[in-house]
């Protein structure tokens, strides 16, 4: 690994044609905005950031925090000189249209996990860059068409995770020089990790295949997986994804039976698509339980379409898919545990 590599240098070497130059400009602009957002978060109440509701709701119906609004403004301002055809943001009901002949469109969540601000927990920014095809409705291509994707983690360090379609690199913000420096190159998701992340309070609402997988993990060394597992749940998508990239495991935000959760809660364009692209580029996998996330396309009328997300180590994602597609797989693997989970319903 080149210890002197920076995000800016990587983008310079990548920008070899007009479309790649637009991608590089977009990633660079988001990186610049993320430095501003990181400083706001770091100042917290000293900068007037309290986690209080702003008084409005975003396009998804979530109550906006004051930092949601400031993060959105920072990103829109940073992208003003980038040649884009359209922007799709969690914080905006409609697309922000640019030059219809521009080579790219950009989808982003300016501040994922903003409900964590007042508890001083990890939040982040997520983005996806796709090619623009003049005459075709923006953001209707499958996720496999993404040119670049990534996310920023505002934690103890501010880290920038990026794929340009050729592996995944992780950069950390050098606060002294205000540049992102490469710390991990061509990251690979570990396969043999005994960790899974899911909000277990929703167990009664899950479909049976999700219950079966969790029951296998809970059974530990005495169960069909013959291994003790730890359950994690941070409630921050970027933090969960970063942990998986650095030490493996699997994250589940499945569909469930609650009203409004039939397609999960995460948004396809600016949450599940970019996360799935990052995971696959790092040798992992991402599925809804039944379909590869990168095979999904958004409807032209649904910028904020939802999708379940199961991502992480390929072996675990594949096992969950197997349980969805072949329910008898649970009883074949371990009849004692297939329907006798540790949670009673």
Curated annotation (Swiss-Prot):
GO biological process: fructose 1,6-bisphosphate metabolic process; fructose 6-phosphate metabolic process; fructose metabolic process; gluconeogenesis; reductive pentose-phosphate cycle; sucrose biosynthetic process
Binding site for Mg(2+) 1: 90, 109, 111
Biological pathway: Carbohydrate biosynthesis; Calvin cycle
S-S bridge residues: none
GO MF annotation list: fructose 1,6-bisphosphate 1-phosphatase activity; magnesium ion binding
InterPro entries in the record: FBPase_C_dom, FBPase_class-1, FBPase_N, FBPtase, Fructose_bisphosphatase_AS
Primary localization class, coarse: cytoplasm
Pfam families: FBPase, FBPase_C
Substrates-to-products reaction catalysed: beta-D-fructose 1,6-bisphosphate + H2O = beta-D-fructose 6-phosphate + phosphate
Cofactor binding description: Binds 2 magnesium ions per subunit.
Family to which this protein belongs: Belongs to the FBPase class 1 family.
HAMAP family per UniProt: FBPase_class1
Protein name: Fructose-1,6-bisphosphatase class 1
Organism in which the protein naturally occurs: Rhodopseudomonas palustris (strain BisB5)
Gene designation per UniProt: fbp
């Amino acid at each position: 690994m080149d210890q002197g590599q920076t995000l800016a240098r990587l983008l310079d070497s990548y920008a070899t044609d007009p479309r790649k130059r637009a991608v590089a400009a977009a990633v660079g602009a988001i990186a610049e905005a993320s430095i501003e957002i990181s400083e706001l978060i770091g100042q917290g109440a000293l900068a007037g950031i309290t986690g209080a509701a702003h008084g409005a709701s975003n396009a998804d119906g979530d109550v906006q925090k004051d930092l949601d609004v400031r993060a959105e403004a920072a990103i829109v301002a940073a992208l003003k000189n980038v040649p884009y055809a359209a922007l799709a943001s969690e914080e905006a009901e409609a697309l922000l249209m640019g030059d219809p002949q521009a080579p790219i469109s950009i989808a982003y969540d300016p501040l994922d996990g903003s409900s964590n601000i007042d508890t001083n927990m990890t939040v982040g920014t997520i983005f996806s860059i796709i090619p623009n095809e003049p005459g075709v409705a923006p953001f209707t291509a499958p996720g496999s068409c993404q040119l670049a994707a990534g996310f920023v983690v505002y934690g103890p360090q501010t880290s920038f995770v990026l794929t340009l379609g050729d592996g995944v690199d992780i950069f950390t913000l050098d606060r002294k020089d205000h540049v992102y420096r490469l710390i991990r190159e061509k990251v690979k998701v570990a396969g043999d990790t005994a960790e899974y992340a899911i909000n277990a309070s929703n167990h009664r609402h899950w479909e049976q295949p999700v219950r079966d997988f969790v029951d296998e993990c809970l059974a530990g060394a005495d169960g069909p997986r013959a291994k003790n597992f730890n359950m994690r749940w941070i409630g921050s998508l970027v933090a969960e994804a970063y942990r998986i990239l650095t030490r493996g495991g699997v994250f589940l935000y499945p569909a469930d039976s609650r009203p409004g959760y039939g397609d999960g809660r995460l948004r396809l364009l600016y949450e599940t698509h970019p996360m799935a692209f990052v995971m696959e580029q790092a040798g992992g996998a991402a599925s809804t339980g039944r379909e590869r996330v990168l095979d999904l396309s958004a409807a032209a009328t649904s910028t904020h379409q939802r999708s379940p997300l199961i991502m992480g180590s390929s072996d675990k994602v594949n096992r969950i898919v197997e349980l969805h597609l072949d329910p008898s797989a649970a009883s074949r693997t371990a009849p004692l545990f297939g329907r006798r989970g540790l949670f009673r319903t």
